C-alpha cells in the first residue's frame, strides 16, 4: 500500500550514505534507501542482509520509491535529525522525525551495543582483546596494533 517514502535531511547530512541504489549488502550499509526498505519489510534493520553479495532486483525496484530531499534546517555537526514521510497509494501520509538516533554523537552506542555489533563478524575472545586494548590505553598505537593483530585493521 506504500506509494513512496521521502527521507528528509538537512543539507549534506547524508554524506556518509553515498549509495542511493546499492547492489550489494556492503553498499547497503551506506544507503538510507536499503535501511528504510529493511525497516518497512521486516520491522527492523536486519544485520545479516549487509553481508549478502547481491541485493535482489525486486528489492532494488522497491528502493527506487524511496527518495531523499534536503529541506530540513542545517544543524550543528554533532546533531542528527531525519524526518521520514510515508505516502500511501490512497494519498494518506505518515511522518516521523528522529533526533539523535542511537549511535550518533549525542546518543552514542553503549559498550554492550558495540560488543553486539562486533559479534556479527568477530569471535568473543577477539572482541574482549579489542575492548581491553581500547579501554586501558591512553595511546593510540597499542590499540591500532591490537586491531591489526585481530585482522580488523588492514593499514
Labelled PLM ranges:
Residues 1-155:
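Terminal-appendage/accessory-domain detector
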Amino acid at each position: 500500500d506504500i506509494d513512496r517514502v521521502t527521507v528528509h535531511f538537512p543539507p549534506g547530512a547524508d554524506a556518509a550514505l553515498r549509495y542511493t541504489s546499492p547492489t550489494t549488502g556492503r553498499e547497503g550499509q551506506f544507503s538510507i534507501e536499503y535501511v528504510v526498505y529493511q525497516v518497512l519489510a521486516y520491522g527492523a534493520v536486519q544485520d545479516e542482509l549487509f553481508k549478502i553479495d547481491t541485493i535482489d532486483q525486486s528489492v532494488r525496484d522497491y528502493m527506487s520509491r524511496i527518495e531523499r530531499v534536503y529541506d530540513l534546517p542545517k544543524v550543528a555537526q554533532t546533531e542528527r535529525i531525519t524526518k521520514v514521510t510515508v505516502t500511501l497509494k490512497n494519498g494518506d501520509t505518515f511522518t516521523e522525525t528522529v533526533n539523535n538516533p542511537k549511535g550518533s554523537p549525542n546518543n552514542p552506542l553503549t559498550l554492550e551495543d558495540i560488543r553486539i555489533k562486533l559479534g556479527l563478524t568477530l569471535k568473543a575472545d577477539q572482541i574482549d582483546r579489542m575492548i581491553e586494548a581500547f579501554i586501558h590505553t591512553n595511546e593510540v598505537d597499542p590499540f591500532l596494533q591490537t586491531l591489526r593483530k585481530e585482522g580488523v585493521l588492514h593499514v
